[in-house]
Amino acid sequence: MNFALQEDSRFDEVGPAGQVLWCLERLEPEGVREIPSELKFTFSDELCCDLSEEMKALELNLDDELSEIEQQEKSQVKEVIICLTYPHWRAGTLPVSVRVDSFIPYAYESERIRFSFVEAKSKEEFPAWVVRKNRYVYGLKDFYDQHELLPGSLLRLRVSKDPGTIIIDPMTHRPKKEWIRTVLVGRDGGIVFATLKQSVTAEFNDRMIVAVPDVAGVDVAREQFAKNKKTLKDNVFAIMKDLSKLNLQGHVHAQELYSAFNIISRCPPAPLFMQLISDPRYTHVGDLHFRIEETG
């Protein structure tokens, strides 16, 4: 039977290593067969410059699956805490980054693998898929909605005794009001940022957290943004100007830029950090904080 299914192109072997599991390809979720639009990086600007060691360390900790980071050796850690970015929050996915890779089930041949998450507190189990070629895990949208997570929320992943499952902890707490960045859709269809009081239900990263009251509006804004002909340089400057209005010093941290830019368009950290280094309009004021230089 297994040989017959292996020879039939309509079927995929989707079990983790050591488990035999077959699935009709057309019955696999669309987000498994095709990369969700929110995860696609489309900018073609080429810019080459060396990142500082500080920036490289931040890039590693951002767990972006598009980052080209060499894995020196297989990690033996038993748990990792990652920060949920807007693209993955919207698509219901998780990145398979260098730090996350050792937690994710693998197969000897298949690039699409079905496995299970187990919620740490409730012990509730739910299915997910890893698409190793494109380095993401699909199937968490309902989980994010159930726990009312926001982009910037922290997730703890733990190794399970069962190689086909991963323990996931949303690190939730009683809802409380916090002043956090909030993305709003303007009359022109573009996005703007404001600091507003919002309900928060889980632990979060201060520089990554963002509330999105109008998700459908942001979807339209992303579509509109994708049609503009501006360069990455111009688009980064527009986001930096908007973010700089949120504090009296006008400083923007590189991590804040990464979080905000990925709301409107998918981009890994390195191209954004390179813009901060190469564009003379920005001055590094320390600890990866940048400000826009006044001209004229």
Task: Name each model feature, range by range.
Residues 1-296:
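Acidic, low-complexity intrinsically disordered regions
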